Amino acid sequence: MKVKVDADACIGCGVCVELCP
């Protein structure tokens, strides 16, 4: 899976919000 490290995208979960449940 592609985990893109983005300050705007990655909040709270440690991974990007797109990959967050």
Curated annotation (Swiss-Prot):
Textual note on the cofactor: Binds 1 [4Fe-4S] cluster.
Residues the record lists as binding [4Fe-4S] cluster: 10, 13, 16
Gene3D superfamilies assigned: 3.30.70.20
Superkingdom of this protein's organism: Archaea
Keyword annotations of the record: 4Fe-4S, Electron transport, Iron, Iron-sulfur, Metal-binding, Transport
Cofactor requirements of the protein: [4Fe-4S] cluster
GO MF term list: 4 iron, 4 sulfur cluster binding; metal ion binding; oxidoreductase activity
Ranges of residues in domain 4Fe-4S ferredoxin-type: 2-21
InterPro entries given in the database record: 4Fe4S_Fe-S-bd, 4Fe4S_Fe_S_CS
Annotated function: Ferredoxins are iron-sulfur proteins that transfer electrons in a wide variety of metabolic reactions.
Subunit structure as annotated in this protein's UniProt entry: Monomer.
Name this polypeptide is given: Ferredoxin
Species: Pyrococcus woesei
